[in-house]
Swiss-Prot record:
Cofactor note: Magnesium is required for nucleotidyltransferase activity. Nickel for phosphatase activity.
InterPro entries, per the entry: CCA_bact, HD_domain, NT_sf, PolA_pol_head_dom, PolyA_RNA-bd, tRNA_CCA-adding_enzyme
Coiled-coil intervals: none
Its biological purpose: Catalyzes the addition and repair of the essential 3'-terminal CCA sequence in tRNAs without using a nucleic acid template. Adds these three nucleotides in the order of C, C, and A to the tRNA nucleotide-73, using CTP and ATP as substrates and producing inorganic pyrophosphate. tRNA 3'-terminal CCA addition is required both for tRNA processing and repair. Also involved in tRNA surveillance by mediating tandem CCA addition to generate a CCACCA at the 3' terminus of unstable tRNAs. While stable tRNAs receive only 3'-terminal CCA, unstable tRNAs are marked with CCACCA and rapidly degraded.
Chain positions recorded as CTP binding sites: G8, R11, R91, R137, R140
SUPFAM superfamilies: Nucleotidyltransferase, Poly A polymerase C-terminal region-like
The protein's name in its UniProt record: Multifunctional CCA protein
Residues at which ATP binds: G8, R11, R91, R137, R140
Protein family: Belongs to the tRNA nucleotidyltransferase/poly(A) polymerase family. Bacterial CCA-adding enzyme type 1 subfamily.
Length: 411
């Protein structure tokens, strides 16, 4: 029995990055032998075990054979006769197909070290095309390793996979899983650039793909292209360290601009409503989790109005806080403002734009939530009277503390 560290742990160590998870391949063993040594079996589809002390994953060396479409259409063969080189051959990229033995010696049959030095994402073998998830993984690695480029022959293979309909067989949960990981990488825009370059974006996220080439008013969007704007927005969200729900909302806030009637371009009247409609279909199709879905819909619907707050009377500002459910969900409202911040600063030349109204809105929200609605309600005789009295008390508190319209308060 021989044990090797493989995959991301070896890759990241060679890149000088922190090693998070360590995976191992075991050559020349059987499931029975692993159990006898105290390893705990956890693999459902192939033999994977947890170390009795470290709880790191140890997988028996295996080969895979394509038996059908999609990422589940595989037959796995694990056997003591399977060699390390055979196991590494089934990996997606050369930089992930490097092994290290217990003495620190590298086993690199597919020249992954050379590709690390050259900063190239290259497929190990033609078997790459058997698993469409690998297209998403390559795109995600491009977002993580921002100095790496996709090898020409790998991009060509990915295009052929898309043309052959392989990505159409992907299950929604797996698409979302990879997109979510990619959005949390260093430069998410690179994931979508790679997916667009190979044609996968049009198949997986047509609502996003059609934004590229759609013009916006140059005065407000010097970058002009709506798709370029969205890429700037998600990269700003990444630099700011915003959460996944905020990044997903940033990605999808302008989907409606892709269906703006040509005769009104570069204006996008009513794009918020169209964005909501497209987004409802997208989140249902990909089975997006509720926290991401709810924030994205909120941002798509209201992101334009937040920039009008400075012109509003106190009562109108309060209605805006009610429309966004800020009083009941202040944490989500903060996330809403974060996505709007990314939208405002994700524009060429506006990266450092001051947004004084945003912290002011949070102050006003905090003030409004201190108004004792319960005490006011006890003095009223009907639900309508309660609603009106509470609203009036909140407006009075706002006007006592701030000068409206707020644009005068912030200069």
């Amino acid at each position: 029995m021989r044990i090797y560290t493989v995959g991301g742990a070896v890759r990241d160590r060679l890149l000088g990055l922190p090693v998070k998870d360590r995976d191992h391949v075991v050559v020349g063993s059987t499931p029975e032998a692993m159990v006898q040594l105290g390893y705990r079996p956890v693999g459902k589809d192939f033999p994977v075990f947890l170390h009795p002390v470290t709880h790191e994953e140890y997988a028996l060396a295996r080969t895979e054979r394509k038996t059908g479409k999609g990422y589940k259409g595989f037959q796995v063969h694990a056997d003591p006769e399977v060699t390390l080189e055979q196991d590494l051959a089934r990996r997606d990229l050369t930089i992930n197909a490097i092994a290290e033995d217990e003495h620190g010696n590298l086993i690199d049959p597919y020249h992954g070290v050379a590709d690390l030095h050259a900063k190239v994402l290259r497929h190990v073998s033609p078997a790459f095309c058997e698993d469409p998830v690998r297209i998403l993984r390559v795109a995600r690695f491009a977002a993580r390793f921002v100095e790496f480029s996709v090898a020409d022959e790998t991009m060509t293979l990915m295009r052929h996979m898309v043309e052959d309909g392989e990505v159409d067989a992907l299950v929604p949960e797996r698409v979302w899983q990879e997109l979510a990981k990619g959005l949390m990488e260093q430069r998410p825009s690179r994931m979508f650039e790679v997916l667009r370059a190979c044609g996968a974006l049009k198949r997986l996220l047509p609502e996003l793909d059609r934004l590229f080439g759609v013009p916006q008013t140059a005065k407000y969007h010097p970058e002009i292209d709506t798709g370029v704007h969205v890429m700037l927005v998600i990269d700003y969200a990444a630099r700011a360290g915003f959460s996944l729900p905020v990044r997903f909302a940033a990605l999808t806030h302008d989907l409606g601009k892709g269906t703006t009637p040509a005769h009104i371009l570069p204006r996008h009247i009513g794009h918020e409503e169209r964005s909501v409609e497209l987004l409802q279909s997208l989140v249902k199709r990909l089975r997006v989790p509720n926290d991401c879905k709810d924030l994205a819909l909120l941002v798509a619907k209201h992101h334009g109005k937040v920039h009008q707050v400075g012109e509003m009377k106190a009562a109108t500002v309060l209605r805006f806080l009610q429309e966004t459910d800020a009083l009941r969900q202040p944490g989500r409202f903060r996330d809403f403002l974060s996505a709007c911040e990314a939208d405002a600063r994700g524009r060429t030349g506006f990266e450092q734009q001051a947004l004084p109204l945003f912290p002011l809105l949070l102050e006003i929200l905090q003030l409004v939530r201190t108004v004792d609605a319960g005490a006011i309600a006890r003095e009223q005789s009907s639900p309508d009277a309660i609603k009106e009295a509470v609203f009036s008390a909140r407006v009075a508190a706002m006007e006592a503390a701030y000068r409206f319209p707020l644009k005068e308060a912030v200069g």
